[in-house]
């Protein structure tokens, strides 16, 4: 038992702060290595433009693929053994893998370790499940929206810090620095997260069919999983072509990398500002209204992105898009809280993470395929169509639902 654990009531606000810090640290740790991932692949012996592109894409995607496979297993274990234990497992496991990545000698070793990183991940969905089971239901939107800003903040700062560290110390040391960040996350979680959890035996655990029958509205929950997948597909579809699109808009300028970095970052900044506020508004008017409104707003912003003429115009539209995006996943998570019990929260959030990871893999593939055949601008129009479908699909799934009265 950690020093922070005793018989006093759990302070969910303190747990939220600590979980936010954990999500920030893991978000930063994951993104620290992203700016130089292709360079590290090259350092491990991969040569040639096409081979380098192929291997960079594979080592990037395989983490999400294996995370999608492993998430339901870890979610079930969280419902049996507790969410805090899963947070500790994830932080420590990823820290050890990062050390091994820094010691990798060839591309195959690195590929296996990237897959292992996906298998051992799961800090964020378990943090969501922990907070969702402790926070008063009428504050779920605000709490989950606030928690989401932790990972976003880390993901924003990570690439910049990773690039600076790689330039200063070389590529391999960054993996060791990343590992130390994850070990710090482990100790922060160990000593400052509190959870009162009664372990459940394997025989007492609900099986998959019982999980489905225990849901208030299983079809609605499945539709929320699909919504999460489509949100990530839409977000990821733009990632492969953003820098090239900015270069096309900017023309002959020397600082296209800096401009691209700024335009890539502004949605995250906007999401930081909007997520807690829109989450709080969702607690008042209903998260389903926030979800549908944000999806429609996203469609109205994606269409003009296809017609912009300058990087500034694109940057402004992406900032506004980020404000809408900041509301989407927290709204989905809040609806999942409303429609499932604490007993199965770990599995529900892990299933949702699996759909999110599948979206993370398929989104960039879709964007790259569309741009290769129809050009950069077509990506935004197709993505707008995908999001519009998501809005109609979500509205149809949610229209008969009435928000239950929630109280402290």
UniProtKB/Swiss-Prot annotation:
Primary localization: membrane
Keyword match Acyltransferase: no
Function: Confers resistance to fosfomycin and deoxycholate.
Compartments where located: Cell inner membrane
Keyword Secreted appears in the UniProt entry: no
Native species: Escherichia coli O17:K52:H18 (strain UMN026 / ExPEC)
Keyword annotations: Antibiotic resistance, Cell inner membrane, Cell membrane, Membrane, Transmembrane, Transmembrane helix, Transport
GO terms for biological process, alphabetical: response to antibiotic
Transmembrane segments: 16-36, 58-78, 92-112, 115-135, 146-166, 173-193, 224-244, 256-276, 290-310, 378-398
Protein origin, superkingdom: Bacteria
Classification via InterPro entries: MFS, MFS_dom, MFS_MdtG_subfamily, MFS_trans_sf, Mutidrug-R_MdtG, Tet-R_TetA/multi-R_MdtG-like
Similarity annotation: Belongs to the major facilitator superfamily. DHA1 family. MdtG (TC 2.A.1.2.20) subfamily.
Protein name: Multidrug resistance protein MdtG
UniProt cross-references to SUPFAM superfamilies, sorted A to Z: MFS general substrate transporter
One of the record's GO molecular function terms: transmembrane transporter activity
Lineage: Bacteria, Pseudomonadati, Pseudomonadota, Gammaproteobacteria, Enterobacterales
Topology of this chain in the membrane: Multi-pass membrane protein
Gene name linked to the record: mdtG
PROSITE patterns membership: MFS (PS50850)
SS bond partners: none
GO cellular component assignments: plasma membrane
